[in-house]
Amino acid sequence: MLKREIAIIGLGLAGQTVAYGFQKKNYPTYLINGSAQDNSTLSGAKNVLVLDGYDGLAGQREFAYEALKNNKTILQKISQIEQKIVVCIASGGGSTGSGSIPLICDILAADPEKVIVPVLLMPRKDEPIQKRLNAYNVAKEISETEGIGATIFINNESYDSLQQINSRLICMLDAFFTDNSHSLGANFDDSEKEKMLKDKGAFVIAMLSNNNTDNQAVSTEDMIQSLTAKNIFLPINNDGVVSNIGI
């Protein structure tokens, strides 16, 4: 089961909140923030790592790099993560998360055996311009970081409730990491999943029931179309350029 190879890092309040959901499903997790007020909202969370000397970053993502760089204990813990696949989750529009996730990914990518999967929770169109600029800059920095695998872009406009979006994200990734179903026809094994996570580019998941509303079997075309349908992920280009599809 791929889950045994997974560690989760949550950066900033948004990233911590999602990572805490994985913690409840018994994934090894690291929750990093510099705001005592933010941390107090995660009642019962374990392994909360505090950016000492920084009680909030006032929306300035450039401060997050300095905050993380000056907290050697946190950097050491990150560099010592044993799991092969590390999922790093942060808000693209925030300060702590968007400012620190490129450095975290860069540190982890120093180990060529690691598979680094950034998850960026992207701001809505009606949010302040600074948040959208933060999201653009962090996405650009992540794309330019050597050794990074697939990137997951979450569309915070997909549902009115952020809690619903977070819940769906946790459910879908957990299903991907834990599914060990098999058949005589074909198997989607852990090595193939790992390859998908290791390849650079946008990563999306679509989940369909066994039967559609007309009680007809779901076709391969249905499955492929669902990848570009409305879901919690940012829309991908419908240009036919795909590296891997796992069904």
Task: Name each region found by the language model.
Residues 1-247:
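Tubulin/FtsZ superfamily GTPase core signature
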